From Swiss-Prot:
Keywords: NAD, NADP, Oxidoreductase, Tricarboxylic acid cycle. It comes from Aeropyrum pernix (strain ATCC 700893 / DSM 11879 / JCM 9820 / NBRC 100138 / K1). This is Malate dehydrogenase. It is an enzyme of class 1 (oxidoreductase). NADP(+) binds at G6, A7, G8, K9, V10, G11, N92, T115, T116, N117. Belongs to the LDH/MDH superfamily. NCBIfam families: PRK06223.1. Catalyzes the reversible oxidation of malate to oxaloacetate. Can also oxidize tartrate. Can utilize both NAD and NADP. Catalytic efficiency for malate oxidation is 3-fold higher with NADP. The lineage of its organism: Archaea, Thermoproteota, Thermoprotei, Desulfurococcales, Desulfurococcaceae.
Length: 308
């Protein structure tokens, strides 16, 4: 069973996409009475229209997630116009700690995937408060960041984004750093296809993509995160050993300990199987460090009970 914690925009977009991909045992949990039940019923009716067999239910009780093999955490407040991910920290950290206790009590064997922002810090809280192995506490971010970079590259070059391999590291926020040197199109290094100015434009568009969506429509991205969550579920369920970037707890990788950072990793049926350490230049190491320090700063502002 796949449990989605939170029946808001991201949670419901995820549920719809999972249904359309054939995942037929879904549970929505949210605190608002009637909200997850109504959403589940609406989605069940849609499935009937489409001829899709699905078992989906809604609940206000966290006990109902017993037996879940994957828990997708989408609960929390979304980013409002003008609000940074960092400003979400205090508002969502307590929610993560509370959900961690619920997951630990009722779904102790589940793989937990977090999309609540600021996701790097929220993943740190979830890891610390569940006490789960780090392989089973995964912050979703990098798939979306890299996909955004691939989209902007494809738009500038007039090619399919399926041919683009884009890499973003560090964190999900303003200190994320796209890595043009390690990105390519059809196997050709990006630096051979685009000018320095064009690459700088792609980097800027990628970093500011989330804020642009929020500014344009008044609330943060939901379809993008949902699509990435679905890819993550598929990689776990199919044991496909895909390499995706995630926000993960580091234990010596890239020279860091006791912090979460966005790095590429192999994912399969047990969660994260290994973190891939890319060869970085001195300038790239500096940018990676800036991202890590930004996450550390966020974590250090949390009360001790949320980070220990």
């Amino acid at each position: 069973m796949i449990t989605i914690l939170g029946a808001g925009k991201v949670g419901m977009a995820t549920a719809v996409m999972l249904m359309m991909r054939g995942y037929d045992d879904l549970l929505l949990i949210a605190r608002t009475p009637g909200k997850p039940q109504g959403e589940a019923l609406d989605l069940a009716h849609a499935a009937a229209e489409l001829g899709v067999d699905i078992r989906i239910s809604g609940s206000n009780s966290y006990e109902d997630m017993r037996g879940s093999d994957i828990v997708l955490v989408t609960a929390g407040i979304g980013r409002k116009p003008g609000m940074t991910r960092e400003q979400l920290l205090e508002a969502n950290a307590n929610t993560m700690a509370d959900l961690a206790e619920k997951i630990k009590a009722y779904a102790k064997d589940a793989i937990v995937v977090i999309t609540t922002n600021p996701v790097d810090a929220m993943t740190y809280v979830m890891y610390k408060k569940t006490g789960f192995p780090r392989e089973r506490v995964i912050g979703f971010s990098g798939i979306l960041d890299s996909a955004r970079m691939a989209y902007y590259i494809s738009q500038k070059l007039g090619v399919s984004f399926k041919s683009v391999n884009a890499i973003v590291l560090g964190m999900h926020g303003q200190k994320m750093f796209p890595v043009p040197r390690l990105s390519s199109v059809g196997g050709v290094p990006l630096e051979h296809l685009m000018s320095k100015e064009e690459i700088e434009e792609v980097v800027s568009e990628t970093v500011n993509a989330g804020a642009k969506i929020t500014e344009l429509r008044g609330y943060s991205s939901n379809y993008g995160p949902a699509a990435g969550l679905v890819l993550t579920v598929e990689a776990i369920k199919r044991d496909s050993k895909r390499i995706y970037p995630y926000s993960l707890y580091l234990q010596g990788e890239y020279g860091y300990n006791d912090i979460v950072a966005e790095v590429p990793a192999v994912i399969g049926k047990s969660g994260i199987e290994r973190i891939i350490e890319l060869p970085l230049t001195e300038d790239e190491k500096r940018k990676f460090d800036e991202a890590v320090q930004a996450v550390k700063k966020l974590v250090e502002t949390l009360p001790p009970q949320l980070r220990e």
